[in-house]
Structures are given as structure tokens and as C-alpha cells.
């Protein structure tokens, strides 16, 4: 697989789970002989929801909730066939969304 890169984009709500999964992917890729660029932290997407505290009156009393989506980007440069096999068999934590582009 000369001259080819694998781009992996990870998303999760919990940054600790995301960083652990990133470390696992990096160690697997390095162990099989590929070089890794990253992890690059991408901007965190923050969604805020504002709702009334009471169900009926008191419009001024509100509560805000937010949902943060953390993202990381990894590039695996010149992957070997062993790297691809190891990444396919890798079992990541629940709650981590993985997008892979060749």
C-alpha cells in the first residue's frame, strides 16, 4: 500500500474515552510498522438547549443544557497489510464513532 494514507476521524461525547481509543489506535499502528501523524484535536462542537424550568408559567426561569462532541483526526502514513488487519480487528470502546477514509 505504498503512497497511500488512512485517515481516521474519531468522535465522542466523553474526551477521556476518545483519548484512550486514540492511544489504542496509535499504538496498534506503530506496533505493525506504520507511521502516524496526529492525533490532531479538531474543534469541539457545542450544542446548547434552553428550556423553561416550570411547565406552565415563569418564562424568566430557564435552564440550559449542553452537549459537547469532541473530535480527533489521525493519519496513518504508508500502512502495511498487517496494519490494516490489526485495525480491522481492533475493538474500541462504546460511544466512539469512527470514520475511516482511504
From Swiss-Prot:
Keyword entries, A-Z: Ribonucleoprotein, Ribosomal protein
Listed SMART domains: Ribosomal_S10 (SM01403)
InterPro entries: Ribosomal_uS10, Ribosomal_uS10_CS, Ribosomal_uS10_dom, Ribosomal_uS10_dom_sf
Molecular functions per Gene Ontology: structural constituent of ribosome; tRNA binding
UniProt GO cellular component terms: ribonucleoprotein complex; ribosome
Superkingdom of origin: Bacteria
Family: Belongs to the universal ribosomal protein uS10 family.
Subunit structure: Part of the 30S ribosomal subunit.
Protein name, per record: Small ribosomal subunit protein uS10
Annotated organism of origin: Allorhizobium ampelinum (strain ATCC BAA-846 / DSM 112012 / S4)
